[in-house]
């Protein structure tokens, strides 16, 4: 029986993948740096902290990690605050899970302020008891850390917890 649900945000809850398609490229070009053709693949599973470190080490970006993250978040900020939409029929599904007592949280690479803004605007934030970000757990989604922390927070057992 389903007791817990750990949700990804971009492309699962929100139709928001396109917002991130060229953030890295746009950021580097704004800095006067031409990105390599495989940049999107290189940073796809990285947290913002990991991507910032990669840009500093690989491209010689002069901003600090925090400055770089702030610049990247600013590129997508308006999209999350004013445009990002829920995937079709998701609101009804979340309501159904909530009504049956399924505990839910989010595990995402997106910064918390953007997650909260979009979900509050879409009126689904209250369905989730916590938001775990790669930045807050200190690891990208290519590692199990974020999912383990989410599972521990929910207090549900693995066989009865679904990752969406």
Regions found by a protein language model. Give the residues of each.
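Conserved G/P- and acidic residue-centered "switch" motifs that form tight phosphate/ATP-binding loops
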Residues: 8, 12, 108, 143
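Substrate-recognition "cap/lid" segment bordering the active-site pocket of phosphatases
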Residues: 105, 111-164
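A structure-centric signal for secondary-structure junctions around beta-strands
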Residues: 1-2, 158
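N-terminal helical cap/lid subdomain that shapes the substrate entry/recognition surface
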Residues: 2-100
